[in-house]
């Protein structure tokens, strides 16, 4: 893919940094390159292969990503995306940069960019299959392979919002890359989320009851909570949608969704998540 075919990358290139030498990255035909000649190829699917070689990790596989695409296409999580997009629109300038850490297919990032006309986005994920989708999810979005637990290939104070949607988090890096007036937006499930699915298909989706306290403990040194919104509703789902819901989660690694009978699947599920925004704490 040529530089001219990567408008999303071009729009956020000033924020990018070489993960090897921390130098600025320039967009060249088919690659990002720093002055030290460290080069990161742009895959034909449009994402940048920054994480490679011995540092590469796998992430979600193709069946999980396909299940996620099908499930999200039903609109079952659209109220969550709207809540996130609205929160983003209240916190960033029109031409701001949104970083989606653990972006998956870029579903939430695309929603935020649709809401804030002129905003630009970057999604980071370790799954090549997910990045193939995320790189093309929006004309103002770019995508790059990265391990979210490592220092991000971004300059200090270079983004206006960080999205953390049901994904692992790195509070220190969130804090480093956010601008002083930037916001961190975190989405996580409550104990009621997918209650019917967890009841009918034991050992499928698990929710850690201590997750909220651990989130607070992890973020407290770096952030102060600003807004907290509960998004809750009942979603009617077909058997295949329920299987896709199983298949897009880590439960797919020890459950074969296709082998779960219709009789064992709920016809409706409770959707219950918290959407919170955080401001930087002085450190």
Where are the regions that the model predicts?
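N-terminal auxiliary segments of SAM/dcSAM-dependent transferases
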Residues: 2-58
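Conserved Class I S-adenosyl-L-methionine
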Residues: 13-14, 229-283
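Class I SAM-dependent methyltransferase Rossmann-like catalytic core
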Residues: 57-83
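Conserved class I S-adenosyl-L-methionine
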Residues: 94-104
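Conserved SAM-binding loop of SAM-dependent methyltransferases across substrates and taxa
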Residues: 105-117
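Conserved SAM/SAH-binding beta-strand->alpha-helix loop
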Residues: 125-129
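A short acidic, Gly/Pro-enriched loop at the edge of an enzyme's catalytic core
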Residues: 149-161
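Conserved beta-strand signature within the Rossmann-like core of class I S-adenosyl-L-methionine
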Residues: 182-189
